[in-house]
Amino acid sequence: MDVGDFVKIKMENTMYCGTLMPSINEDTIVVKMKSGYNVGLKKTKIKSIEILKPENSSNFQPLTSSNNEFKPLNLEKNPNLKNISILSTGGTVASRVDYKTGAVHPAFTANDLIRAVPELLDIANIKGRAILNILSENMLPKYWVMTAEAIKEEIENGAEGIVITHGTDTMHYTAAALSFMVESEVPIILVGAQRSSDRPSSDAALNIISAVMAATEPIKGVYVVMHGEIDDTICNLHEGVKVRKLHSSRRDAFKSVNNTPVAKINPFTKEITYLREIKPQNSSKIKKVSINKKLEEKIALIKVYPGIDSEILKFYVDKGYKAIVLEGTGLGHTPETFFSGIDYANKNNVLVLMSTQTINGRVNMNIYSNGRELQSLGVLPCEDILSEVLFVKIMHLLGNYDLKDAKKLICKNRVGEINESINLKY
């Protein structure tokens, strides 16, 4: 019995059929079920094992160093389609099973995505490029810079749209960073998946198809494309600075905050319905792109909670941090016991910015005395900027301006991160 055999395993009260997988535990047999999920079975509880020939089977082979090479893609350009570059950074959308551990790890290059989703070739001329291969929780500011540099290079080489595959956990941080760092006339679309490609419930293919569709549109700016509903119906196009992951596992985890999505994308009919005004591109400047790579990394993001110790702020100040973003309660408040830490930061020229942990809504520190006193201590209320976006924005500002100018610019709407008014519906 070898890895890759299709087997029927009888236990005392049940039976399992599936593909035999490698196991790192000598006492356990691992089987990949038809559902796409793995099950581990203790050998001592197995009554019998029978090798079967699966329906429509081909000889299964796990990826190894000797068989994971593919022949180069031979793609002919269609002059009627736009040229789209897919840049892979890793994550669930670009993952497959690790047959050593049974876990899912990043493994696909961008070209592998084309092989997995051949429908892309009916939408655009695709160029694939892997720039990173990381889980998104390992994303670093220096990787934002690498991504921005890759975007610039692709646009200068003729890309008319960019798709970036990215893990979902920190995708909204990267979307915000690229929004501030990259100035371009082409759409830059980030896309991820909540369920990996080996699972029947995977959202990867529909999300990628929808992302490439969006990348062919005559719009500019940075966006996120993900499932718009739990079912495989539509995907939503979100502004990169007004979107957040709001569920740990649902396929429609990403939502626009304080506004509607920019558009709904139907990957089946290939229709895009815009829900509000877009940022039209200037096609005569399609190859013009500039990036600003300067970021101040000594920025902290702190969630306010009952009993929070002001020593936390003093710690960051003493460690040389340049700015601190607070996720305040409600309209932008902190406990009074936190005031001494804020005062300490202000006296040491450390900028303290206020967002709200409610996510939806706007900071307003003029209503209650707590907010007014915080302002007197130097805290700047930052409208309806999402805390993660505010964190990235001040990194960008302090990387390019002194403290005085950064204070003036923090509440200036630069790339759509501030809504002048909020529809009560959202």
Curated annotation (Swiss-Prot):
GO terms for molecular function: asparaginase activity; ATP binding; glutaminyl-tRNA synthase (glutamine-hydrolyzing) activity. It comes from the Archaea. It comes from Methanococcus vannielii (strain ATCC 35089 / DSM 1224 / JCM 13029 / OCM 148 / SB). PROSITE patterns: ASN_GLN_ASE_1, ASN_GLN_ASE_2, ASN_GLN_ASE_3. Allows the formation of correctly charged Gln-tRNA(Gln) through the transamidation of misacylated Glu-tRNA(Gln) in organisms which lack glutaminyl-tRNA synthetase. The reaction takes place in the presence of glutamine and ATP through an activated gamma-phospho-Glu-tRNA(Gln). The GatDE system is specific for glutamate and does not act on aspartate. The keyword Lyase does not apply. The lineage of its organism: Archaea, Methanobacteriati, Methanobacteriota, Methanomada group, Methanococci. Heterodimer of GatD and GatE. It catalyses: L-glutamyl-tRNA(Gln) + L-glutamine + ATP + H2O = L-glutaminyl-tRNA(Gln) + L-glutamate + ADP + phosphate + H(+). The keyword Ligase applies. This is Glutamyl-tRNA(Gln) amidotransferase subunit D.
